UniProtKB/Swiss-Prot annotation:
SUPFAM superfamilies: ABC transporter transmembrane region, P-loop containing nucleoside triphosphate hydrolases. ATP 2 binds at G536, R1046, S1071, G1072, C1073, G1074, K1075, S1076, T1077, Q1124. Changing R47Q: Found in patients with cholangitis; uncertain significance. The lineage of its organism: Eukaryota, Metazoa, Chordata, Craniata, Vertebrata. It comes from Homo sapiens. This is Phosphatidylcholine translocator ABCB4. Changing T201M: In PFIC3; greatly reduced expression; alters efflux activity for PC.
Length: 1286
């Protein structure tokens, strides 16, 4: 008789949000995936189960079968009991108030009912135990397996070779770690138990049906194949649409992660609307698919209910015929009818379980595919040679190479190079000629296409991969630090390093002094990607990290590029010392740093065209000679004043070199990534939940108010559907009443009428169920799209201090964006329809029941609060569980994101195992929560299931008493019972949404906190002045500033400076002195503070207007920025350049002109797809110099009034720098320009040079004036020029 339970089971189905996987496959694979649904085998899904899991699943399955058999068995008892009622009470035609208690049949009836009550109670006790074991054991087994799958998947990602990351879209891998694996969790947990329960109910129902009355069973079964076919079609349609929907959400997730990861670039170029449009485009696609899914699924559902009611009509018509002809008793007919009905409905209950399982198989296909992917270069492999000692002789033999992602673009074209043990070989050449590629091949990040690389005469492919990388120390041009302490970052160099060794390495790298000035010293957290440190500080820590490794082979790829003048000579000396006795390969654009190398190899077009010592190559007058000449002319401050003949001077000139400005990351980068500044990789996210105000559900629904017509139609249909069940109860009690004494012809006539009524109810239910599901489904899809869009828009609106918060790292925000909206929809949309339906069901049932028998109604209603309290307790406990789970998975997600984003550094440092162990440690929390959830869910589920059996016992025993005492008729007992119990079961189903509701409330609270947060600097604000005329005068007046995340570290301490229209202001000073902070304040990433009583009037002026009073969008539109670490987006070169001006459509001609001005056009023309070439994630497919030139083109296309150049030419090689410098000089004409540079030769023509020290202006004037002062600037120029003799 579990009609309503079945109905609810059928009506429930996964919403689009539940299918919100984020796919991490290449775009090519994605396109393929949308066409065909790929799934793994059923048993393969459980491949990570051990004997304990198998035991849990086996016992869970046995108990699910026992639980599922309970209802059909109860129907046998119900049938026999009905016969007793009809035989004992039905043969008497006494008025309602007449008492049977004095008559013998009454006493017999009470005795019989007591016996049946014991049967019901016994079944209830069995169900109580079975349901608990079924749910809790399957949930436990799922929790254990999911922990292993997460672990294996993360291990598999870390194990892949770098070429795999080039081809696959890594931005989606973290979302896959959370979302896709959650889908597997959904599919292999309690829903499998529910499936077996439904299957057991199905078979038990039909077996009971055949035993008790095969004729009626066969007639009812005639309609079953059609029902089964409609269920199969439904499942197939759902699966196909879910798959397409997942792909659309995956693309949206990738857009969001990319934009949030490059938030400063997005804000500086006013790209928020463009990013939002890109995001919304994918969301719109997902919404459309979701709506089509709702239409298809609900037509199938309407047909299913039409068929179900048609089967009622047929069954009652034929059953009544058999009873009237005395072939069956009424009890037999009822047993057969309800057993078959329950069996058929269980198919409906199994449908969502099948769907969840299908989703899990789809998600697992890609997850397991990555797990099973065996890389050619496996860093976890134990195979390979591990010699006891390595001399360090290196040899390249005819090496050819092209990157996997651009196989048709050859980088190395027959490279031959020999390096003797202990030798230092310098690789020089233009940007993109293959120097850095050589360094990557030595580390076996890639294998050559042809040729071999040997160490000590052995092919490096014969060495153990981990061993090979451990003997190599690397300092790259873009040093990546991890979000932990300085000490821990240096420990990544070598696992078992002591504090003394750390201090020694730090002193050698000239970082000791600045570390000791920090409040937390070695325990200072560096922020995400080292954002809390300046570029020079980061670079020195990276050098210390390499030195502590004590490597046999040292690879220095622009190792001193980010150092200021004060540090570079000392660090260069430290590196010279570190090179002693080691084979060293140095890449440098600044040729003075490599003059003393044993061998200098000149690269051109992927081959070495010349090699020899400095003096030998100068005599040859080839590539090297040409590069030196170009550089010398650029670096002499004034040839008559500085002589560079001194060898010593040349070496000291070194580090600031060519790239010196690239990737300085200076204090500027207190950026977004200071996110992690407070908490290291061991992120504590306790604060995340602390101040989240609860949100009423009404507030969430208000976001759906524009869809009110859908809600009105849907609610009316839901109420109608809710009323169908009590209507069924009324008809059902009337049918039983027919079989009392009376004329058979009249009985048959009445049965025919009731059968037609059933058919009519079926036709109504087709329309009402379709409309209910479709309207709420569509409204739910619109809400999900709206919530995601609003959340992303709200994130893009926030000020920089919000992104600096450790809780708002890219990984955490991406995870929240992917899950919060989905979880809110999990408790709205179609779920809301079911709640409305179930409330209508119970409400109508109670009203009818009070009319027909208030005494029995009151008894039954006493059961309802118990079920309700059980639901509330479950919700409270699961809410706490959901909160902890969310928090702990975010912490794990941060570790995963950091490792995946910086995979090259992780691999170079051989720290894959370290990151894996940290991730695994963070998985213990979610696992512990899943264990608690298993028991809570098991207990509450079993109570709600067993209460129905206990209520049968109480109801019919008390019902017998009421009949015997003349208070009710048997038909009324049946009516009241079926109306109330089915209503209560519906309420139980409503309470089963408790976990979803708990998650939804928490997610909604987070979303509304985000929506309602008013940023200090609102990027979307329309307020503020938008002057018609803007000259470009800038004044800083006593500006005091500290970064919000490090309020106790002063950056600017009373800064005053002035730039007139059209002037070029150059800012110079040591790394971390506040130069880039000036640029950030101009961009209004932050507003200045008043630090002391002396600076109460501190403010920032542009053209006499306080910057705060200008419209922030208008202000940023006047500024063009080229930063030291250019971030490009994973789209075409043309799109990246056009990103410079997001206020209009930029023409192709303008793009080409800007590219020519930035000297990148000739390179682009050599690419197969030219301007349509994709640059890869963060521009990884391009060299540093190529990226920088595209960034310059991007700034030039903006035609800004004020140009901000923060180390704009830092990544350029000798050939390009001069041309680009000329282009920038030209671009500066008529514009106010602020230039930050370590290489002082690039700024000698500035109108005003300002020397910073400790956040204040120490000197200012022209180049000549400052030289004449013989102060700080004079010393810096002297050091760079290589002599103190002026």
């Amino acid at each position: 008789m579990d009609l309503e339970a079945a109905k609810n089971g059928t009506a429930w189905r996964p919403t689009s949000a539940e299918g919100d996987f984020e796919l991490g496959i290449s775009s090519k694979q994605k396109r393929k995936k949308t066409k065909t649904v790929k799934m793994i085998g059923v048993l393969t899904l459980f491949r990570y189960s051990d004997w304990q899991d198998k035991l849990f699943m086996s016992l869970g399955t046995i108990m699910a079968i026992a639980h599922g058999s309970g209802l059909p068995l109860m129907m046998i008892v119900f049938g026999e009991m009905t016969d007793k009622f009809v035989d004992t009470a039905g043969n008497f035609s006494f008025p309602v108030n007449f008492s049977l208690s004095l008559l013998n049949p009454g006493k017999i009836l009470e005795e019989e009912m007591t016996r049946y009550a014991y049967y019901y109670s016994g079944l209830g006790a069995g169900v109580l135990v079975a349901a608990y074991i079924q749910v809790s054991f399957w949930t436990l087994a799922a929790g254990r397996q999911i922990r292993k799958i997460r672990q294996k998947f993360f291990h598999a990602i870390l194990r892949q070779e770098i070429g795999w990351f080039d081809i696959n879209d890594t931005t989606e891998l973290n979302t896959r770690l959370t979302d896709d694996i959650s889908k597997i969790s959904e599919g292999i947990g309690d829903k499998v138990g529910m499936f077996f329960q439904a299957v057991a109910t199905f078979f038990a129902g039909f077996i009971v049906g055949f035993i008790r009355g095969w004729k009626l069973t066969l007639v009812i079964m005639a309609i079953s194949p059609i029902l089964g076919l409609s269920a199969a079609v439904w499942a197939k349609i759902l699966s196909a649409f879910s798959d397409k929907e997942l792909a659309a959400y995956a693309k949206a997730g990738a857009v969001a992660e990319e934009a949030l990861g490059a938030i400063r670039t997005v804000i500086a170029f006013g790209g928020q609307n463009k990013e939002l449009e890109r995001y919304q485009k994918h969301l719109e696609n997902a919404k459309e698919i979701g709506i089509k899914k709702a239409i298809s699924a609900n037509i199938s559902m309407g047909i299913a209910f039409l068929l179900i009611y048609a089967s009622y009509a047929l069954a009652f018509w034929y059953g009544s015929t058999l009873v009237i002809s005395k072939e069956y008793t009424i009890g037999n007919a009822m047993t057969v009818f309800f057993s078959i009905l329950i069996g058929a409905f269980s198919v409906g209950q199994a449908a969502p379980c099948i769907d969840a399982f299908a989703n899990a198989r789809g998600a697992a296909y890609v997850i397991f595919d990555i797990i099973d992917n065996n890389p050619k270069i496996d860093s976890f492999s134990e195979r390979g040679h591990k010699p006891d000692s390595i001399k360090g002789n290196l040899e390249f033999n005819d090496v050819h190479f092209s990157y996997p992602s651009r196989a048709n673009v050859k980088i190395l074209k027959g490279l031959n190079l020999k390096v003797q043990s202990g030798q230092t070989v310098a690789l020089v050449g233009s940007s993109g000629c293959g120097k850095s590629t050589t360094v990557q091949l030595i580390q076996r990040l890639y294998d050559p296409d042809e040729g071999t690389i040997n160490i000590d005469g052995q092919d490096i492919r014969n060495f153990n991969v981990n061993y090979l990388r451990e003997i190599i120390g690397v300092v790259s041009q873009e040093p990546v630090l991890f979000s932990t302490t300085i000490a821990e970052n240096i420990c990544y160099g070598r696992g078992n390093v002591t504090m003394d060794e750390i201090k020694k390495a730090v002193k050698e790298a000239n970082a000791y002094e600045f570390i000791m000035k920090l409040p937390q010293k070695f325990d200072t957290l560096v922020g995400e990607r080292g954002a809390q440190l300046s570029g020079g500080q980061k670079q020195r820590i990276a050098i210390a990290r390499a030195l502590v490794r004590n490597p046999k082979i040292l690879l220095l790829d622009e190792a001193t590029s980010a150092l200021d003048t004060e540090s570079e000579a000392e660090v260069q000396a430290a590196l010279d010392k570190a090179r002693e006795g080691r084979t060293t390969i140095v890449i440098a654009h600044r040729l003075s740093t490599v003059r003393n190398a044993d061998v200098i190899a000149g690269f051109e077009d992927g081959v070495i065209v010349e090699q020899g010592s400095h003096s030998e190559l100068m005599k040859k007058e080839g590539v090297y000679f040409k590069l030196v000449n170009m550089q010398t002319s650029g670096s002499q401050i004034q040839s008559e004043e500085f002589e560079l003949n001194d060898e010593k001077a040349a070496t000291r000139m070194a580090p600031n070199g060519w790239k010196s400005r690239l990737f300085r990351h200076s204090t500027q980068k207190n950026l977004k990534n200071s996110q992690m500044c407070q908490k290291s990789l061991d992120v504590e996210t306790d604060g995340l939940e602390a101040n989240v105000p609860p949100v009423s559900f009404l507030k969430v629904l208000k976001l759906n108010k524009t869809e009110w017509p859908y809600f009105v139609v849907g609610t009316v249909c839901a109420i109608a559907n809710g009323g169908l069940q009590p209507a069924f109860s009324v008809i059902f009690s009337e049918i039983i009443a027919i079989f009392g004494p009376g004329d058979d012809a009249v009985k048959q006539q009445k049965c025919n009428i009731f059968s037609l009524i059933f058919l009519f109810l079926g036709i109504i239910s087709f329309f009402t169920f379709f409309l209910q599901g479709f309207t709420f489904g569509k409204a739910g899809e619109i809400l999900t799209r709206r919530l995601r869009s609003m959340a992303f828009k709200a994130m893009l609106r926030q000020d920089m201090s919000w992104f600096d918060d450790h809780k708002n790292s890219t990984g955490a925000l991406s995870t929240r964006l992917a899950t919060d909206a989905a979880q809110v929809q999990g408790a709205t949309g179609t779920r809301l329809a079911l709640i409305a339906q179930n409330i209508a069901n119970l409400g109508t049932g109670i009203i009818i029941s009070f009319i027909y028998g208030w005494q029995l109604t009151l008894l039954l209603l006493a059961v309802v609060p118990i079920i309700a309290v059980s639901g509330i307790v479950e919700m409270k406990l699961l809410a706490g569980n959901a909160k902890r789970d969310k928090k702990e998975l975010e912490a794990a997600g941060k570790i995963a994101t950091e490792a995946i984003e910086n995979i090259r550094t992780v691999v170079s440092l051989t720290q894959e195992r370290k990151f894996e162990s940290m991730y695994v440690e963070k998985l213990y929390g979610p696992y512990r929560n899943s264990v608690q959830k298993a028991h809570i869910y098991g207990i509450t589920f079993s109570i709600s299931q067993a209460f129905m059996y206990f209520s049968y016992a109480g109801c019919f025993r008390f019902g017998a008493y009421l009949i015997v005492n003349g208070h009710m008729r048997f038909r009324d007992v049946i009516l009241v019972f079926s109306a109330i119990v089915f209503g209560a079961v519906a309420l139980g189903h409503a309470s089963s949404f408790a976990p979803d509701y708990a998650k939804a409330k928490l997610s909604a609270a987070h979303l509304f906190m985000l929506f309602e947060r008013q940023p200090l600097i609102d990027s979307y604000s329309e307020e503020g002045l938008k002057p018609d005329k803007f000259e470009g005068n800038i004044t800083f007046n006593e500006v005091v500033f500290n970064y919000p995340t490090r309020a106790n570290v002063p950056v600017l301490q009373g800064l005053s400076l002035e730039v007139k229209k059209g002037q070029t202001l150059a800012l110079v000073g040591s790394s971390g002195c506040g130069k880039s902070t000036v640029v950030q304040l101009l961009e209004r990433f932050y507003d200045p503070l008043a630090g002391t009583v002396f600076v109460d009037f501190g403010f920032q002026l542009l053209d006499g207007q306080e910057a705060k009073k200008l419209n922030v969008q208008w202000l940023r539109a006047q500024l063009g920025i080229v930063s030291q670490e250019p971030i490009l987006f994973d789209c075409s070169i043309a799109e990246n350049i056009a990103y410079g001006d997001n206020s209009r459509v930029v023409s192709q001609d303008e793009i080409v002109s800007a590219a020519k001005a930035a000297n990148i056009h000739p390179f682009i023309e050599t690419l197969p797809h030219k301007y349509e070439t994709r640059v890869g994630d963060k521009g990884t497919q391009l060299s540093g110099g190529q990226k920088q030139r595209i960034a310059i083109a991007r700034a030039l296309i903006r035609q800004p009034q004020i140009l901000l150049l923060d180390e704009a030419t830092s990544a350029l090689d000798t050939e390009s720098e001069k041309v680009v410098q000329e282009a920038l000089d030209k671009a500066r004409e008529g514009r106010t320009c602020i230039v930050i540079a370590h290489r002082l030769s690039t700024i000698q023509n500035a109108d005003l040079i300002v020397v910073f020290q400790n956040g204040r202006v120490k000197e200012h004037g022209t180049h000549q004036q400052l030289l004449a002062q013989k102060g700080i600037y004079f010393s810096m120029v002297s050091v760079q020029a290589g002599t103190q003799n002026l």
